[in-house]
């Protein structure tokens, strides 16, 4: 298995993230009650152990697991089906780098209680307190019971149109009257792809945002529409084609999103799920880290 040393990864970053002023992040993000994490899907072309190395090289202390894990750089395994040996190897590697695993997702939580219980059991075994999921409506009562039993949060994630939870109104409907352990995993990039204003979406979800897949995007270059072979008609996607860019350089108005989360008194994780330049996204993610730290420092100074 190919492993990258911290120094090797730091050199790849191209900016001296490891030498950033630690006080900048501490006095800003920590004062606001915020943490920045890497979502493992960001480095899906690499092994989970390389993902841990890259997270540490970025100077980050938090990471989330995706629904499947790449153990050796080639083969993936459904995360909740990891063997005890592999699960412990991941926990040990993260702990050795000073990294806390904060959530898993997107995971499947079906109405079948035994199947959903296995997911909660795995989260407890890994010391993880949040599951990111898109439960079908019929599963919500089961999910609520298990949240209370395990004291584990479930954050409902939004994919773009036409997925069930693309609109925050649907997320609110799902959690209305339920335990505060149930809320939203706000994927701000998918809101943009669905033609929604992330700031307005966050306002709707006030008090129910548990965690975020935080993104800044720009539209893809226009392409000719494809033709559906059966009908000969032009295929039109319901969501916009967009891709990730360093935070603060896209159309997401991310500073206003962060200001809104501060206004709400949000405490939690800003997850980096960077889905562009898969082979060498580290330099761009380093710019996201710099933006996050600088913006946190700025917001923490204001009343």
Name each region found by the language model:
Residues 2, 20-40, 46-62, 172-183, ...:
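Histidine-acidic metal/acid-base catalytic patches
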Residues 20-21, 28, 88, 92-183, ...:
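Active-site acidic/histidine proton-transfer and metal-coordination neighborhood
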Residues 64-89:
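Glycine-rich, proline-tolerant flexible connector loops at the mouths of alpha/beta enzymes
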Residues 10-18:
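Hydrophobic h-region of N-terminal signal peptides that target proteins for export
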Residues 64, 103, 132, 155-156, ...:
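Conserved beta-strand positions in the central sheet of alpha/beta enzyme cores
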Residues 73-74, 164-167, 222:
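Short, charged, surface-exposed secondary-structure boundary motifs
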Residues 1-8:
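Bacterial N-terminal signal peptides that target proteins for export
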């Amino acid at each position: 298995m190919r492993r990258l040393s911290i120094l090797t990864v730091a050199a790849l970053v191209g900016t001296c993230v490891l030498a950033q002023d630690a006080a900048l992040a501490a006095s800003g993000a920590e004062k606001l009650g915020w943490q920045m994490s890497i979502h493992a899907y960001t480095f899906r072309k690499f092994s989970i152990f390389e993902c841990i190395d890259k997270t540490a090289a970025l100077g980050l202390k938090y990471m989330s697991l995706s629904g499947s894990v790449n153990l050796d750089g080639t083969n993936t395994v459904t995360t909740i089906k990891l063997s005890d040996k592999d699960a412990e190897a991941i926990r040990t590697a993260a702990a050795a780098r000073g990294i806390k695993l904060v959530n898993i997702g997107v995971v499947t939580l079906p109405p079948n209680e035994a199947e959903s219980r296995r997911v909660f059991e795995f989260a407890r075994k890994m010391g993880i307190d949040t599951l990111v999921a898109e439960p079908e409506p019929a599963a919500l009562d089961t999910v609520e019971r298990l949240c209370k039993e395990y004291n584990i949060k479930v954050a409902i994630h939004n994919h773009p149109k036409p997925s069930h939870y693309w609109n925050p109104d649907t997320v609110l409907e799902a959690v209305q009257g339920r335990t505060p352990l149930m809320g939203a995993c706000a994927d701000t990039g998918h809101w943009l792809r669905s033609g929604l204003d992330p700031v307005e979406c966050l306002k709707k979800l006030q008090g129910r945002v548990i965690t975020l897949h935080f993104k800044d995007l720009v539209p893809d270059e226009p392409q000719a529409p494809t033709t559906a072979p059966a009908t000969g008609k032009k295929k039109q996607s319901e969501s916009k084609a967009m891709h990730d860019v360093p935070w603060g350089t896209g159309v997401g108005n991310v500073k206003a999103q962060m200001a809104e989360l501060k206004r709400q008194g949000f405490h939690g994780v800003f997850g980096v799920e960077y889905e562009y330049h898969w082979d060498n996204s580290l330099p761009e993610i380093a710019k996201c880290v710099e933006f996050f730290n600088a913006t946190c420092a700025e917001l923490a100074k204001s009343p």
